[in-house]
């Protein structure tokens, strides 16, 4: 799934090649230099081609229990860079809550304005660095929008410490234009070509009550279509929010990020209703869940672990046959 790699420089070859490519493209001025770097760019791009899309949506929540033990252990050797604002808290809040229920889902997170993973643990834990120096509250222009933000993300990728990087929207998609979303897609693709040993994880924006005809849904569809057509990794934040654990769809009832929906001018909350109907369910274990209900965070945690198992090499099927894979030492 990943290009053959070792931490601290990707065998001192692949990672350093991508780092030199970035520097060279910025400084190249002659035709021969540009041609040489262009050839290297194409070579690196070819190594970043993946056989299928990985879409972590509400179906991943339902498939979470089917993660084979072998691939769960592989997922716990993974490292991820995560950047976000408050809505993005929901992912790590749910993952931490899941670990409190079931310690086998070991998770370690370090949030700081300086780059760095939490220490390795024994037995292994999936490790996350939360931030994008010099900040931890990361808006578009701190990660992908504008050269300064892009370079901050590159600085983290340049360390060679991470299998993947993910950034979460807040409310920006609700008012976004098609061109704005395309700029986001193009930038993540550029990161992928510069760092072929990493996966850059795409994301949809949280629900806003606009239903299937609203701008948010249309722009989320733009992201989904791109990811499906180009074999990307997508954490489908909005899709997870529109379904309860049994698959009931609330999108066209005005579902929003708080799990509220409307019938006949009356507001309801599907998460509260579901938990009232399923007392004692693991999905309903209380936790801090920014802007939402614990059920929402708990579902996102399950989709996240499913996605990380897929990134570790699981083919999504059970029983699973281990695939050839070289992970970081």
Where are these regions (language model features)?
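Enriched but not universal
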Residues: 2-3, 10-18, 319-329
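Bacterial N-terminal signal peptides
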Residues: 32-43
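Boundary/junction segments of secreted and surface-exposed precursor proteins
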Residues: 48-69, 319-329
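N-terminal carbohydrate-binding/catalytic regions of secreted carbohydrate-active enzymes
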Residues: 55-155, 310
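Structural recognition of the beta-strand scaffold that forms the well-ordered cores
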Residues: 79-83, 106-113, 127-128, 163-169, ...
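Oxyanion-hole/transition-state-stabilizing segment in secreted/luminal serine hydrolases
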Residues: 140-181
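Substrate-gating cap/lid alpha-helix
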Residues: 205-246
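Histidine-centered active-site loop/cap adjacent to the catalytic His
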Residues: 255-319
């Amino acid at each position: 799934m990943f290009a053959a790699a070792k931490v601290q420089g990707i065998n001192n070859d692949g990672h350093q090649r991508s780092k030199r490519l970035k520097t060279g493209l910025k400084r190249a001025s002659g035709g021969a230099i540009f041609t040489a770097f262009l050839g290297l760019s194409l070579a690196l791009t070819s190594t970043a081609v993946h056989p299928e899309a990985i879409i972590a949506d509400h179906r991943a929540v339902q498939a979470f229990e089917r993660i084979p033990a072998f691939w769960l252990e592989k997922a716990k050797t993974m490292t991820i860079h995560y950047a976000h604002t408050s809505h993005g808290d929901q992912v790590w809040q749910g993952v931490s809550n899941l670990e409190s229920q079931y310690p086998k889902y070991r998770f370690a997170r370090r949030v700081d304005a300086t780059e760095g993973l939490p220490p390795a643990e024994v037995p292994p834990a999936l490790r996350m660095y939360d931030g994008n120096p010099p900040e931890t509250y990361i808006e578009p222009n701190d990660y992908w929008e504008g050269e300064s933000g892009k370079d901050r993300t590159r600085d983290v990728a340049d360390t060679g410490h991470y299998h993947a990087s993910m950034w979460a929207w807040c409310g920006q998609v609700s008012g976004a234009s098609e061109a704005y979303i395309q700029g986001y897609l193009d930038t993540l693709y550029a990161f992928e070509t510069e760092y072929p040993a990493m996966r850059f994880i795409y994301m949809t924006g949280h629900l806003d009550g606009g239903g299937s005809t609203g701008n948010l849904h249309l722009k989320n569809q733009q992201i989904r279509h791109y990811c499906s057509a180009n074999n990307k990794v997508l954490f489908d934040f909005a899709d997870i929010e529109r379904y309860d654990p049994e698959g009931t769809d609330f999108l066209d009832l005005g579902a929003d990020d708080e799990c509220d929906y409307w019938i006949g001018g009356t507001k309801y909350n599907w998460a509260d209703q579901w938990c009232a109907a399923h007392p004692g369910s693991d999905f309903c274990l209380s936790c801090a869940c920014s802007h939402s209900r614990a059920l929402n965070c708990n579902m996102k945690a399950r989709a996240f672990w499913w996605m990380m198992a897929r990134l570790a090499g699981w083919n999504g099927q059970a029983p699973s046959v281990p695939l050839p894979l070289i992970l970081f030492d």
